Amino acid sequence: MAKILGIIGGGQLGLMLTEAAKKMPEHISEVIVLDPTQNCPASKAGAKEITADFKDEIAISELAEKCDIITYEIESGNSEVLKKLESKCTINPSPDTLKIIQDKLEQKKFLTKNNIQVAEFAEVNKLDE
C-alpha cells in the first residue's frame, strides 16, 4: 500500500523530493509539505501544503496525523515535537539525529566520538575565549 510522505521544508530540496516521490506512485501516494511560504517550490511539483513555521508544534502534529512518513529538508525543525510524534508515524532521519545536527558543536563531538574525521575545532563558551 502506498504511503503519504510528509516533508518539513518545501524549498528546492522539498521540490526535488516531491518530484522523486511522484515517480514512485506504488510507494508514495501523496506528498504534503510544511513550509512558512505559501506556494512554496514543492507545491509547484504537486505537494499539498501546510503553511506554518518549521517549529510550529500544532502544524507539525497536523503533518504527523496526515502522513505515514515524515522527513525534512531543513535543519530548522522542532526535534522535541518530532520526538513526541515518533509513535504516530515513521520519522527519518530520527529526531535524535536532527537534534545533533542542529548544534554544530554537538555534531562535531558526535562525529569525533564515532571516529569520523572533522576539521579541528574548539569549544568556545565566552567571547574572550
PLM features per residue range, with description:
Residues 1-102, 106:
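ATP-binding N-terminal substructure of ATP-dependent carboxylate-amine bond-forming enzymes
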Residues 100-129:
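Active-site nucleotide/adenylate-binding loops and adjacent lid/helix of ATP-dependent enzymes
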